[in-house]
Amino acid sequence: MTQEKQRCADAISLAQQGIKVALISSGDAGIYGMAGLLIELLQKLDAKFRPSFAIHPGISSLQLAAALAGAPLMNDFCAISLSDKLTPWETIKERINGALVGDFVAVIFNPQSNERNWQLKTTIEMFLKYRAKTTPVLVARQVGRDQQKKRIFNLDSIPIHEIDMLSIIIIGNSSTKLVNNFLISPRGYL
């Protein structure tokens, strides 16, 4: 995560030369991917120098993790990245508070890295003020890869020391429950 601008600029340059280009972003290019950056860079160009392009959907790690868990995203949910590289921590905290007040299921991206290891603990403490300690939580790692793992915990027993940037976390809302080792956030059909 430091070469996105250059990759987009290179793709634009090649496309301007008439070369067909595929700019690949992991997961879905529009969900924490490079689609937004590409559009921003293209908008800085004079219209006559903008190559045409299309954005194709991918499968996001939140979808893969949700499928591993069962059906935790059946009702309203939000996705929040804890990385403060591009977004100030105060803004991230406001978004977490919004998720808490709205009782959203929360999908946590970029939970912690070697350099940034305190935000996840703070986030869990924030959730514990609004949610029951027994709220079910999925911790998945390397989703979609051969080393994929999933584990389900209560909110108060998340093994923070085992979580890294290859992890994704789904924290249930007040109606999320564990049924036969699957998480479900019922929509209200039954």
Label every PLM stretch briefly.
Residues 26, 82-84, 110, 142:
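Cofactor-binding loop segments of dinucleotide-utilizing enzymes, especially the Rossmann-like FAD-
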Residues 13-17, 43, 67-74, 97, ...:
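Generic secondary-structure signature for well-ordered alpha-helical cores
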Residues 20-21, 101-190:
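A contiguous loop/helix-start segment that scaffolds small-molecule binding in enzyme catalytic cores
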Residues 2-6, 29, 33, 60, ...:
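Conserved active-site and cofactor/substrate-binding residues in soluble primary-metabolism enzymes
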Residues 8-11, 64-66, 146-153:
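Short, solvent-exposed polar/charged micro-motifs at secondary-structure junctions
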Residues 1-7, 78-86, 189-190:
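Short, acidic/turn-prone active-site loops that include or flank metal/cofactor-
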Residues 1-53, 159:
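Class I S-adenosyl-L-methionine
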Residues 31-102:
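Class I SAM-dependent methyltransferase SAM-binding "motif I" and its flanking Rossmann-like core
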